[in-house]
Structure formats: structure tokens, C-alpha cells
């Protein structure tokens, strides 16, 4: 489509980058309106998530009491929208509830200062006090029998506990998706608690839901980080790229409408406006299902599902078939003699169309890569359109994309080859060594958590078809590295990490990949107690055993950052043999106390 057609389209429809599908009338009582739209069950679930994400230390019972009070008040407003306080904004109503909590300052410290502010500053203040790494004990899943007994006694309370425990550990979890995962959890329990062998039915199914939910959480946190640091424009660019890949037959106007509304929905959830977010997400799903003809041929299966499953399905729907007759992208964006004129007349829209056209042709690229290419294209036009002969200057821009494309492709090949050779645990260890060398000042628990999460990319992505690997690997790594940055921001210790985390979100992964050994680091002193183990390690679950061994590995690298792969392998093999021998010994304690010091000596000698 020629650029002039885009301009006509904009002229007729207003700004294609500013209009969405939501067309809501103002309501006398916002809370009554949301209660009516969402229904009591979803309303109560969302209010519980909201309170749990703001007040992460409160017990379930405290939150359940607040939820019931808010629900009762909403019902009053449904009955009479002109009743006292029903016209107040949701922020005001929720904020007043939070500020009325007994002992707020004793339990939450500076968060209590937010209560001296007026809206919207008060809500912004609450958001700033959300803790991405709250000091809560790990969530332990009860035994199958105990879980089924609790579930059968009171399914509503059981699922309420699930929402509360997940939400307070993940204060930016996408609330409508958390309702979806709770629904999945409920269905699994309903099915498995009727089985004779509850444990073997529940464990794999609940593990699967947990894994998907954790990935959903880190992805949503990255979206909120993008919104918080770079504003709506950056998020909308992400949405345009992602939607264009998924719906390559939709026209630019349709994609920008969807991107505008997706941006609104995510902004609401990231800002804690969970009732609006869930309501608008349902509206967006409804719009997509009513307009399948102009969006995608792949939506019908999703649209046949009930609300929560429908919205989840639409967010993960497979890519539509790419149009067969797409012209070369160079025609409008390189060869056209009026590129600079078109760019100057409407920069954001011109760049938006470039991103749309490039993305719909490349479902095999990651969104991060597509945004880096758009950024390169923008920088080229900024430079070239100021020169005497712009076409000669920007004529090679598409060829200049090649190094940017090759870098992540090489990353995927190298890492997937390594994963196939080592398996997940060995691959995690390789990443742990790599990242400890890059940022040895970062705390060992943070490095181990990051390496374990980054290492899962192999299992998650390397078994996929070739054309799906790159988007899977890079977009997953970007989300995990965002968490590394969030944790590092609280207690910055590494200039390397600060440098990568301070720049653009889409440049972070390449920045981390390019880091080398930190030459400024003064190695840690070798401490024997760091490598001293006791017989209790023998009875730990496999995951916790791995974490203990990976903690020792990170400490070894901090002691000897330039240790060779062979040296580290020798030490870790010796360590594994030591554990195997002592855990099989008749007198484990004696074995650990006598062989442990010998292991420490051998470690020091191997790394000398």
C-alpha cells in the first residue's frame, strides 16, 4: 500500500495511533459499573489480587475481610448509584481502604506516608512501594491428600488462598491472567481429587500450570517496566510489532487500533487498576471475536471458549498465514523518492507503518530484534534526511540490518548447541559461570536464580522448529534479564549490570551478551566454610541439591574469576563424587566431617 493511502486513512479516521475500540459512556458510580460488568466472582477475585499486590505482608484473612467490605459496598452502589461515596473513583475507594489498615506504619514503614497524599499521587506512591522480591517464605505446595481435603471443604476459600499467595509474591502479575490460572488450578483439583492416586494426577499438572504462570509473571513485569521507564509509546511499538507478526493479514489501521487498546489494558493493570484492566480486556476480546474477518482466520477456536479461556487463548493464538503477494519492503521505505517527506510529515505513523510492514514479514524474528531494526531505521532517516542527497545515504539501510539480525541468530545457535550437549542442569551451570564472571559483585542467590531461569530457555525454546527459536529465546531472555535489573536497582553493586540496565529495554540482552570478565573485580578470599557440607544435603529434593551445588560453583568463580572451564569441571566433578560417596556411606556424618576438609584442600589446589 502506498504511503499516500496511509495519510488518507489517517485523515478520514482521525489518528490511527490514538483511537481504539473502547467507547464507554461515563457512569455515575464506577464501582457499580465494574461490578455489573465483571460479575461477583471475578470482581471479588480482582479486588483480592489488588489488595494482595499492594499490601504484601497481610494475611489472607485480613485481605478477605477487606474484599468482603468492598464487595458489600459495590452491591450498595449497584442498588442505588447515588448512595453516599458511590461516585468516588476506584483509586480513592481502594486507597482509603488501604490507609485504614490498623498498624500500617508498624508493618509497612514508609508506605504509610503515601496516605498523606491526594489522588493520583497517593496511588503512584503505593505503586512505588510494591516489592518485586518480598521477604516471604517460598510457597510450599501441601501434600495431595491435605490439598484435596481443603479444596473439598471450601473451594472458594482454597482458591482465594491461591490468588493471595501468588499475587503478593508477584505484585505485577497480570490480574485477568491470574484469574485464568486460578481457574486452571480449580479444574485440575476437581479432576484429580476424584482419582485414586491423587499425587500422580496432581503433580505434573500443577507443575505445568506453575511453570506457565511464572513465565507469564516475568513477561508481564517486563511490560510494566517498559511502561514505567519509557512510557506508552514504547509499549505501543512493542504491541504493533507483536500484533503484526500474529495478524499479518490485518491492515495497519486495525493493528494500531488493537495496539492502542492493548496498551490501555496493560497500563491499567500495571497501575493497579485491575477492575478496569479486566473489564477492558474482556471488551477487547469481544471486539476481536466480532471482527475476525479483518483480523485473522485463526481466532474462531479461541472465540468459542468462555471469557477467561478466550482472552488467554487470543493472547497466545498462532500466527495467521502470511499474505503471498507482499511487495518488497524497499519499495515504500527505501526506493520511494519521498521517504524523507513522508517521514517528516508524520514521524510516528511512518515509523509505525515500517514496523508493521517489517514485522508481518518476519514472524521468525523476536519483537526485541524488530524494535532494534526500527530504531536503526529511524536513526538512519534522522541522519540522512538532513544531508544533501538523502536517497544515496539511506539506500543501503536494509543491508545494514544484517549484523543486527546475525547477532541473535548466532546467539541462538551457540546456546542451543550447548544446551543439546550439556542438558538443562549443565547448561544452567555454564550460564552461571558466564554471568558470575561478567558481574561477580552481584549476590550469589541472585546469580543462581538468574542462571537457573536463563538456563530453562534451552528446554523451553531449543526443541522448537527453527523459525520459532529466535523469538522464543530472545524474548524469554529479555524478560528474565529485566528481573535481574529490577533486583539490581535496589542494591546496585556492579557497574557492568548498571550499564546494561540503564539503557533501552530492547538493547539489554545484546548488552549482557557482550559483557566480558569484569577486570575491576577483586577476587573473594577462599573460605572453607563456603564449601563445607553436611549430611542433610543427602535428603534434599533434587532441585535444592542443584541450588546448593550451583551456589558453591558461583562462589568458586568469585574466588577465581579467570578459572578455566577445565579447572571448574575438575572441581565440580570432584564435588559431585564427594556427595555421591558420602550420601551412600553407612555413617554419613563421619564421611562428611572427614572427607569434607580433603575436598576443600583439593579445590584450592585445583584452582591454584
UniProtKB/Swiss-Prot annotation:
GO terms for molecular function: DNA binding; enterobactin binding; exogenous protein binding; fatty acid binding; identical protein binding; metal ion binding; oxygen binding; protein-folding chaperone binding. Zn(2+) binds at residues 91, 271, 273. Residues 19-24 form a propeptide. Cu cation binds at residue 27. GO terms for biological process: cellular response to calcium ion starvation; cellular response to starvation; negative regulation of mitochondrial depolarization. Phosphorylated by FAM20C in the extracellular medium. InterPro entries: ALB/AFP/VDB, Serum_albumin-like, Serum_albumin/AFP/Afamin, Serum_albumin_CS, Serum_albumin_N. Ca(2+) 1 binds at residues 30, 268, 273, 276. The modification N6-methyllysine is found at residue 558. The modification Phosphothreonine is found at residues 444, 446, 570. It comes from the Eukaryota. The keyword Signal applies. Pfam families: Serum_albumin (PF00273). Plasma. Expressed in the granular cells within the cerebellum. Ca(2+) 2 binds at residues 37, 279. The modification N6-succinyllysine is found at residues 229, 460, 543, 588. The modification Phosphoserine is found at residues 29, 82, 89, 297, 443, 513. Residues 19-211, 212-403, 404-601 form the Albumin domain. Keywords: Calcium, Cleavage on pair of basic residues, Copper, Disulfide bond, Lipid-binding, Metal-binding, Methylation, Phosphoprotein, Repeat, Secreted, Signal, Zinc. It is found in: Secreted. Disulfide bonds join 77-86, 99-115, 114-125, 148-193, 192-201, 224-270, 269-277, 289-303, 302-313, 340-385, 384-393, 416-462, 461-472, 485-501, 500-511, 538-583, 582-591. Part of a complex composed of complement component C3, CLCA1/CLCA3, A2ML1/OH and ALB/serum albumin. Interacts with FCGRT; this interaction regulates ALB homeostasis. Interacts with TASOR. In plasma, occurs in a covalently-linked complex with chromophore-bound alpha-1-microglobulin; this interaction does not prevent fatty acid binding to ALB. Binds water, Ca(2+), Na(+), K(+), fatty acids, hormones, bilirubin and drugs. Its main function is the regulation of the colloidal osmotic pressure of blood. Major zinc transporter in plasma, typically binds about 80% of all plasma zinc. Major calcium and magnesium transporter in plasma, binds approximately 45% of circulating calcium and magnesium in plasma. Potentially has more than two calcium-binding sites and might additionally bind calcium in a non-specific manner. Belongs to the ALB/AFP/VDB family. This is Albumin. It comes from Mus musculus. The gene is Alb.
Amino acid at each position: 500500500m502506498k504511503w499516500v493511502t496511509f495519510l488518507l486513512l489517517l485523515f478520514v479516521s482521525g489518528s490511527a495511533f490514538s483511537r481504539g475500540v473502547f467507547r464507554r459512556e461515563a457512569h455515575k458510580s464506577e464501582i457499580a459499573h465494574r461490578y455489573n460488568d465483571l460479575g461477583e466472582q471475578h470482581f471479588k477475585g480482582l479486588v483480592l489480587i489488588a489488595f494482595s499486590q499492594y499490601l504484601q505482608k497481610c494475611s489472607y484473612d485480613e485481605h478477605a475481610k477487606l474484599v468482603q467490605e468492598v464487595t458489600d459496598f459495590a452491591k450498595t452502589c449497584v442498588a442505588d448509584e447515588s448512595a453516599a461515596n458511590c461516585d468516588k473513583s476506584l483509586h480513592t475507594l481502594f486507597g482509603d481502604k488501604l490507609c485504614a489498615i490498623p498498624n500500617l506504619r508498624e508493618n509497612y514503614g514508609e508506605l504509610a506516608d503515601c496516605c498523606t497524599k491526594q489522588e493520583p499521587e497517593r496511588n503512584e506512591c503505593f505503586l512505588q512501594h510494591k516489592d518485586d522480591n518480598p521477604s516471604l517464605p517460598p510457597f510450599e505446595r501441601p501434600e495431595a491428600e491435605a490439598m484435596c481435603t481443603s479444596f473439598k471443604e471450601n473451594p472458594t476459600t482454597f482458591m482465594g488462598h491461591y490468588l493471595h499467595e501468588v499475587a503478593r509474591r508477584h505484585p505485577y502479575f497480570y490480574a485477568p491472567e491470574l484469574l485464568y490460572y486460578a481457574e486452571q488450578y480449580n479444574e485440575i483439583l476437581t479432576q484429580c481429587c476424584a482419582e485414586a492416586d491423587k499425587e500422580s494426577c496432581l503433580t505434573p499438572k500443577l507443575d505445568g500450570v506453575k511453570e506457565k504462570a511464572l513465565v507469564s509473571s516475568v513477561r508481564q513485569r517486563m511490560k510494566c517496566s517498559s511502561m514505567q521507564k519509557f512510557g506508552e509509546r514504547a509499549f505501543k511499538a512493542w504491541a504493533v510489532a507483536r500484533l503484526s507478526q500474529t495478524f499479518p493479514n490485518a491492515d495497519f489501521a486495525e493493528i494500531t487500533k488493537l495496539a492502542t487498546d492493548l496498551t490501555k489494558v496493560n497500563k491499567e493493570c500495571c497501575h493497579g487498576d485491575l477492575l478496569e484492566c479486566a473489564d477492558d480486556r474482556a471488551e477487547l476480546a469481544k471486539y476481536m471475536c466480532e471482527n475476525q474477518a479483518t483480523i485473522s482466520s485463526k481466532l474462531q477456536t479461541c472465540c468459542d471458549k468462555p471469557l477467561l479461556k478466550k482472552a488467554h487463548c487470543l493472547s497466545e493464538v498462532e500466527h495467521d498465514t502470511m499474505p503471498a503477494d507482499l511487495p518488497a519492503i524497499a519499495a515504500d521505505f527505501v526506493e520511494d523518492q519521498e521517504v524523507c517527506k513522508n517521514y517528516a510529515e508524520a514521524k510516528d505513523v511512518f515509523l509505525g507503518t515500517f514496523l508493521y510492514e517489517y514485522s508481518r514479514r518476519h514472524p521468525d524474528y523476536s519483537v526485541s530484534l524488530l524494535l532494534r531494526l526500527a530504531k536503526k531505521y529511524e536513526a538512519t532517516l534522522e541522519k540522512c534526511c538532513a544531508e544533501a542527497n538523502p536517497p544515496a545515504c539511506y539506500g543501503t539501510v536494509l543491508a545494514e540490518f544484517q549484523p543486527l539480525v546475525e547477532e541473535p541468530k548466532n546467539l541462538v545457535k551457540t546456546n542451543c548447541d550447548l544446551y543439546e550437549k550439556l542438558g538443562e542442569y549443565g547448561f544452567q551451570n555454564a550460564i552461571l559461570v558466564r554471568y558470575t564472571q561478567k558481574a561477580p559483585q552481584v549476590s550469589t542467590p541472585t546469580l543462581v536464580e538468574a542462571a537457573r531461569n536463563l538456563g530453562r530457555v534451552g528446554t523451553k525454546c531449543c526443541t522448537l522448529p527453527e523459525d520459532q527459536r529466535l523469538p522464543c529465546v530472545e524474548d524469554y531472555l529479555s524478560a528474565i534479564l529485566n528481573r535481574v535489573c529490577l533486583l539490581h536497582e535496589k542494591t546496585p553493586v556492579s557497574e557492568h549490570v548498571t550499564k546494561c540496565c540503564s539503557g533501552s529495554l530492547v538493547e539489554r540482552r545484546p548488552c549482557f551478551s557482550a559483557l566480558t570478565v569484569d577486570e575491576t573485580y577483586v577476587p573473594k578470599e577462599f573460605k572453607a566454610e563456603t564449601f563445607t557440607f553436611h549430611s542433610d544435603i543427602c535428603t534434599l529434593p533434587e532441585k535444592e541439591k542443584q541450588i546448593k551445588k550451583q551456589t558453591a560453583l558461583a562462589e568458586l568463580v568469585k574466588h577465581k574469576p579467570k578459572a578455566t572451564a577445565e579447572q571448574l569441571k575438575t572441581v565440580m566433578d570432584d564435588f559431585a563424587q564427594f556427595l555421591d560417596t558420602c550420601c551412600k556411606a553407612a555413617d554419613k556424618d563421619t564421611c562428611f566431617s572427614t572427607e569434607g576438609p580433603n575436598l576443600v584442600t583439593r579445590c584450592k589446589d585445583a584452582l591454584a
